[in-house]
Regions:
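Short intrinsically disordered terminal tails
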Residues: 1-2, 98-101, 162-168
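Charged, amphipathic alpha-helical stretches
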Residues: 2-37
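Acidic, low-complexity, intrinsically disordered interaction modules
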Residues: 25-152
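Long alpha-helical solenoid repeat scaffolds
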Residues: 3-7, 14-17, 48, 89, ...
Length: 168
């Protein structure tokens, strides 16, 4: 099962760009703090990273966040982006499974694993109303951000080619 830093390493570049663009525009303090933290970790001056062209800066951020040492940062960035930019996707998935959630699609405790068939019924409509690459990232993050995850979801993530995180 991929961990949050693995998800960053494997997600398609277009999704990485979406994520960092969202953070830069909507979560500027978090974005700048992330740059500062990662630059210091790599013994770089923050201004050196911050002044890079956006595309180059985002490639650098992805490479650094994708390292094992940055597992916590990767998990936090995924959570902020998914809840902030894709709450509808989260809600649609949980509604499809009949799981109660707040208006942002977050839950306090993970309920017992649904059947594989129930998961398929909840996931299938997501591909018609949401970016399929974002659906794949969300489901991998959903699985990775809980210590146990759901075995039935782990099987689907491994079997369904639409849910693969092949970075191009």
């Amino acid at each position: 099962m991929p961990t949050p830093h693995d998800i960053f390493a494997q997600m398609p570049p277009a999704v990485v760009e979406q994520l960092f663009s969202f953070l830069e525009q909507k979560e500027k303090p978090l974005y700048m703090t992330t740059i500062d933290t990662l630059a210091k970790q790599r013994k770089l001056r923050t201004i050196f990273v911050a002044r890079k062209p956006r595309a180059e800066r985002n490639v650098w951020l992805r490479e650094v966040v994708a390292k094992n040492i940055n597992e916590g940062i990767a998990a936090h960035l995924l959570q902020i982006w998914l809840v902030g930019a894709h709450a509808k996707l989260l809600c649609d998935f949980l509604d499809g499974l009949g799981i109660a959630h707040d208006e942002n699609g977050t839950i306090e405790t993970l309920p017992p694993a649904p059947s594989k068939d129930a998961l398929l019924k909840a996931i299938e409509p997501l591909f018609t109303t949401h970016d399929p690459a974002v659906v794949a990232v969300y489901l991998h993050a959903f699985q990775a951000l809980d210590d146990q995850g759901w075995p039935s979801l782990a099987e689907l993530l491994a079997e369904d080619p639409r849910l693969q995180l092949a970075a191009a």
